[in-house]
Amino acid sequence: MATPKTEQGTYTAVVLDFETGGLDCTRCACTQIAMQAVRLDTFEVLGRYANYIAPYDRQPLGGAPKRKVLKTRREIEQESVSETMDYEAAALNYTDITMELLRTRGIPLKQVVAEVIDFARKHTLSKGPRYKPVLIGQNIPFDVGFLQQMMAYAGLQKEFAQVFAGTTDFYGNFQPHYLDTIDLARLCLAADPQVTSYKLELVAERLGIELDDAHDADADVTATREVAALCSRRMRQDGDTDVSQQRTPKTRDHFKI
């Protein structure tokens, strides 16, 4: 009996970075998003996306139904006043993003979310759940929190789960699969005594990667992609961890006599 042929599909990833109005995704706004879609076999860039996000208001995200109570007209009017998401001065200064820039160049949040969904769908190259793109980022759990906030605010959690690789957690929430370049860098550089921090700019410098305009989402995505690509190539070279990229003997140090 002939062995059934298996088609080798193409795995992809979306390299992601946010700039935000603070560190807490439950109350702070997204201010800028950047993405690059890549093939995981060659790290060829398939597409790019970057936008500022217009200021938006805080929204209720469900929870247990509340008991109805009678309210005065004044109370109703006060509740109708929207509460803006937090845009902390320190965060805006850190990223060199102003509220005026967001008002004039920012895209409405729901439009951005729809474009993120379309971006992931467009750059999925093979059919089947295992070929949905994974996320790649530097300290990516931070970005995932803000990505989940955006999806919830736009009401597109279902579509989010349809286009990205991931699983449903104990509480029924979709958790996207991701690769953190901090972990990839540790795999490659943990034995390097000159590496004492895994901040993006320091890892990029150690690996010989040029980082332009740090703390800009688009520039950070490019550097993150290059870090992931370089770490991947080294791990594919039978354990070559030398920064100079020279071949090292396969014999492990602790086996040498």
What role is predicted for each listed range?
Residues 30-34, 151-155, 223:
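Glycine-rich, phosphate-binding/catalytic loops in enzymes
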Residues 2-141, 215:
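Conserved non-catalytic scaffold segment of RNase H-like nuclease domains
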Residues 200:
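Pyridoxal 5′-phosphate
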Residues 142-176:
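Substrate-recognition/cap helix-loop segment adjacent to the acidic, metal-dependent catalytic center
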Residues 209-211:
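Conserved nucleotide-sugar donor-binding catalytic segment
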Residues 166-193:
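Short alpha-helix plus adjacent loop in nuclease-associated cores
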Residues 20-22, 183, 223:
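Short, glycine/acidic-enriched loop or turn micro-motifs at the edges of active sites
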Residues 1-7, 204-206, 215-218, 222-257:
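Acidic two-metal-ion nuclease catalytic site recognized across multiple nuclease folds
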